[in-house]
Amino acid sequence: MRQKSVRIAVFEQAAEIYYMDILETIKEQVTANPILLYMKGSPEQPQCGFSSQVSQALMACGEKFAYIDILSNPEIRANLPQYSDWPTFPQLFVAGELVGGCDIIMEMYNSGELLPIVKSATSE
């Protein structure tokens, strides 16, 4: 019985370390890229309508941006909502801060608020 509980404790500790590693990876991605979009698919081949809308809005701003395909990165997909405290995808980070998801980004794009935020992130 004792050995079983030790194994469980070791497994739980390993799971905690793995979880922390994923969160650290996300943090590094967010801080290393002035504009980062977590999306389904790629800007050239989005795999959902929301990701398509946001990537098109970003491309219309005329600045380069990084993206991560969460469909190809299941660990990121599973843990990003805990990191960002945002439950849905896509998620746009600018200058290390979460800007929002599709509805917010499209509202900002249509009102002209997105362009200056994107431009300021690339000029820093």
Where are these regions (language model features)?
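Acidic beta-strand-to-loop metal/phosphate-binding motif
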Residues: 38, 91-95
